[in-house]
């Protein structure tokens, strides 16, 4: 058994490597001596790694202590910030107002937040932002109803009253109110002779299913029932998920391009173009399935600037190269940048969590004891809020309806702190493809 103590192993090597001549028969062989040396080298390497890790941790602690001491003035600083109110028509998350504690805000459906969604208590006793408030959303302000439809406001929703000949939740579809294109008046397919019988000197007539009796007695005719028009009226259930086409005595449902009709003949299902046998995207790009279509993406890392550069470690992630020891600005840039793509239907019910950001510590290493989440970029910040769901997780929440087709981008940030000292931050760039349909 080889001693585990480095000192004991070293003494053993000295004794056994150079014995007295008369005891040479008890010496270690060359192979045994080399094996013992290798074990000692491995042991020293492990000790060196643990020592370096301890030094790094001690430096971090000393830097945090230096920062906290430097902030202390001659007078005692406040240990808490003023109380914050819950916004009218909104909610507040967080009841502690001590230094470095966070408070988050969100609004009820039908309202949007004006002001910061999160604030942090600073050591000087002030918050990082003003008290936010909730403002009512006018769902009709974007004029969502098409083709002369009238918009009616609702709570976090709207309703379109369509003019004759139009249908759909935004009056975007043309209702089939007459015979198909190419037919002529009196087409026998849409008007048929009734079946009549003489009963007790009176004539009784009836029509096949899907037709109704029209006209005066003795001159009646069976006219087609336009189910698409009948069930397209306000308050009646929809016959079709997408578009309804009237047919003689019945109807059929159609789906838009990029969708297939399911076995029930009414529902539509998106076709995933990205799983076909033949690739649809050029080499070097990745196919992202969207509602009724697809996108070919190839995200790129930020260009290098000065002593800051990034390397692509996977198709959807970039990592920052190590920073020079004296470069403080470099360390405050994102350590990792990841890319994410989501496909959503129009008019998705809100609020709903779309994306989740979290951290986990490597085994044997001290992880961050404080995380801060926020929205740091994008083209539609007002549609989203970033809210902490637990100590290690932040949720990106959609709080306003999205009307397609459109593409939204939002950048979310997670910053790590150890004993109030900044360690690193990570950015996730989320791209959202909104389809023109609500299915």
Curated annotation (Swiss-Prot):
Main location: secreted
Maturation and modification: N-glycosylated.
Glycosylation sites: 124, 307
UniProt-annotated location(s): Secreted, Extracellular space, Extracellular matrix
Signal peptide: 1-24
GO cellular component terms, semicolon-separated: extracellular matrix; extracellular space; focal adhesion
Disulfide bridge partners, by residue number: 81-121, 107-134, 140-151, 145-160, 162-171, 228-244, 240-253, 255-268, 274-287, 281-296, 301-318
Keywords, sorted A to Z: Calcium, Cell adhesion, Coiled coil, Disulfide bond, EGF-like domain, Extracellular matrix, Glycoprotein, Heparin-binding, Repeat, Secreted, Signal, Sushi
Coiled coil: 28-53
Any GO BP annotation: cell adhesion
PANTHER family, A to Z: EGF-LIKE DOMAIN-CONTAINING PROTEIN, FIBULIN-7
Known role: An adhesion molecule that interacts with extracellular matrix molecules in developing teeth and may play important roles in differentiation and maintenance of odontoblasts as well as in dentin formation.
Name by which UniProt lists this protein: Fibulin-7
Name of encoding gene: FBLN7
């Amino acid at each position: 058994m080889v001693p585990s103590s480095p000192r004991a192993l070293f003494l053993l090597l000295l004794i056994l490597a150079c014995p007295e001549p008369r005891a040479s028969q008890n010496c270690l062989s060359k192979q045994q001596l080399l094996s013992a040396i290798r074990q000692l080298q491995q042991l020293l390497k492990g000790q060196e790694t643990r020592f370096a890790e301890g030094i790094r941790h001690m430096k971090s602690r000393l830097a945090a202590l230096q920062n906290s001491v430097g902030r202390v003035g001659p007078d005692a600083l406040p240990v808490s910030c003023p109380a914050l109110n819950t916004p009218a028509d909104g909610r507040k998350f967080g009841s502690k107002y001590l230094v470095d504690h966070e408070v988050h805000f969100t609004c009820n459906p039908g309202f949007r937040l004006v002001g910061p969604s999160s604030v942090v208590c600073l050591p000087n006793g002030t918050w990082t932002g003003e008290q936010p408030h909730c403002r009512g959303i006018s769902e009709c302000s974007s004029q969502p109803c098409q083709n002369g439809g009238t918009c009616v406001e609702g709570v976090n929703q709207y309703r379109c009253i369509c003019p004759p000949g139009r249908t759909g939740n935004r009056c975007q579809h043309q209702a089939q109110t007459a015979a198909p294109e190419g037919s002529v008046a009196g087409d026998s397919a849409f008007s048929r002779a009734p079946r009549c019988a003489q009963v007790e000197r009176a004539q009784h007539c009836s029509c096949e299913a899907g037709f109704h009796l029209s006209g005066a007695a003795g001159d009646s005719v069976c006219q087609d029932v336009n189910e698409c028009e009948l069930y397209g009226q306000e308050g009646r259930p929809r016959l079709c998920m997408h578009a309804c086409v009237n047919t003689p005595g019945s109807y059929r449902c159609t789906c838009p391009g990029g969708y297939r009709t399911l076995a029930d003949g009414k529902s539509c299902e998106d076709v995933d173009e990205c799983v076909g046998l033949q690739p649809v995207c050029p080499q070097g790009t990745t196919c992202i399935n969207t509602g009724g279509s697809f996108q070919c993406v190839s995200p790129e890392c930020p260009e290098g600037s000065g002593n800051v550069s990034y390397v692509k470690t996977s198709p959807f992630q970039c990592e920052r190269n190590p920073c020079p020891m004296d470069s403080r600005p470099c360390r405050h840039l994102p350590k990792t940048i990841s890319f994410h793509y989501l496909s959503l239907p129009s008019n998705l019910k809100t609020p709903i969590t779309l994306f989740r950001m979290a951290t986990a510590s490597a085994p044997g290493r001290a992880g961050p004891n404080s995380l801060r989440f926020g929205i740091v970029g994008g083209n539609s910040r007002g549609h989203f809020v970033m809210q902490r769901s637990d100590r290690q997780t932040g949720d990106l929440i959609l709080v306003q309806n999205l009307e397609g087709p459109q593409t939204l981008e939002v950048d979310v940030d997670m910053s790590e702190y150890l004993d109030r000292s900044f360690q690193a931050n990570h950015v996730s760039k989320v791209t959202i493809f909104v389809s023109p349909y609500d299915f």
